[in-house]
Amino acid sequence: MALPIIIDCDPGHDDAIALVLALASPELEVKAITSSAGNQTPEKTLRNVLRMLTLLKRPDIPVAGGAVKPLMRELIIADNVHGESGLDGPALPEPSFAPQSGTAVELMAKTLRESAQPVTIVSTGPQTNVALLLNSHPELHTKIARIVIMGGAMALGNWTPAAEFNIYVDPEAAEIVFQSGIPVVMAGLDVTHKAQIHAADIERFRDIGNPISTIVAELLDFFFEYHKDEKWGFVGAPLHDPCTIAWLLKPEIFTTVERWVGVETQGKYTQGMTVVDYYFLTGNKPNATVMVDVDRQGFVDLLAERLQYYA
């Protein structure tokens, strides 16, 4: 039986590729997709979800737009990474269908309520929508199997010296998620910076030769440029968000540890930092499965294999 999932995302090049991977995988049943503000403004990320589903010919999947700003802060976006549209690079179709009239939280709650089995929530943007769901529907917590997030880091940040972007945008929401008591799986920068796509990998995807693999290659062409900056020390571009979907499909290519994670919401220098108790110093019981390593070649091979689904 396919694993039921809800995807909450803020497309974003890597979010878009995570959607491509999920919808090419019969092991997963994508029951709903919700959009969050983050990589771009809420209007643009919602539009990008609809554009991607139009491209992938999946207007059957319910879509709803989420919170327009973080729980307690003004919105920060990453247009320097993802461009004016949020998905700059390829020519994507205009949406062929409309989102649901309700909110992301309403669609998530309805999906959980109607599911015969617990649902995995995959969140590849800020945690605002998920936190709102958890706070407003405590009766549905038991319907959530786990929450798999792209966010955080044990060590270095990518938006501030201490903080990864998704967590920095809404640290209060992330803290709600980590302390919810629901199993959390964290794909942070420790693993996503190892899941780099090299120039040769982009050409491998392009050579698959179907319309979707071509779009993915063009998305990566644009995404690659930002990561050429010498300050990162990268060979390629880290493909953050697809690590969440890849872990659901092939957990054996990832190395994980069970640890307690908290989110700093007040720090002068460390706001948005995910504090990972790696050496069990707090006495707190682990609340997260933290990804720390990945078989990069296995990750690339999985993407290439699933892109052939669209032939």
UniProtKB/Swiss-Prot annotation:
UniProt key word Cell membrane: no
Active site (record annotation): 240
Tree of life domain: Bacteria
GO CC terms of this entry: cytosol
Keywords: Glycosidase, Hydrolase
Membrane-traversing stretches: none
Family: Belongs to the IUNH family. RihA subfamily.
Protein name, as recorded: Pyrimidine-specific ribonucleoside hydrolase RihA
